[in-house]
Amino acid sequence: YSSYCRLWIHVEGDKEPAYYGVYEMIEAIDDKYVKRRKDLFGDHKHNLWKCRWGATLNYNDIHGANIYYDDDSGANYTYELESNTDNFETAKAQLIEFTKNLTQRQGDDFHDWIASVCDVRLLLRTYAVNVAVGMWDDYWNNCNNYYIYFNSSDRDNYKFFFIPYDYDNTLGT
């Protein structure tokens, strides 16, 4: 989430605080973000992925994708594991299996699977908000600027959450 604030800095000895302008405050999406929402997510200790440009969630594309964990190197990866990095290989296998199911299941099989791993209403509401605000730099337009969270490390038994971010250009900041 983001908001704006007016920043004044009070320097000891000065008569009035100094006004520094309007700044954007952005809540980081990290393990603390997930922990603050553990009632929604059902857990806060599992796999949070940052997904950048090219993160299609398509099983046919993921094998050539740049999948790594946050190593503080400053490198940008298509899919970057932000939490639970000690279990990277397990998290990566879960992500790949998720994309396989998302891409290859069809009909009632897909319907039953997606309903079991995702709050479909919440996902559709998220998409509707992105459309309503004209979000042009997101998953649905550029396969970009979103996080996904799996509330379990189990390859088949989890809930998936889609977390969009980076609305600054869309909202005119």
Question: Which residues does each PLM region occupy?
Answer:
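Phosphate/dinucleotide-binding and metal-coordinating scaffold of catalytic cores
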Residues: 1-173
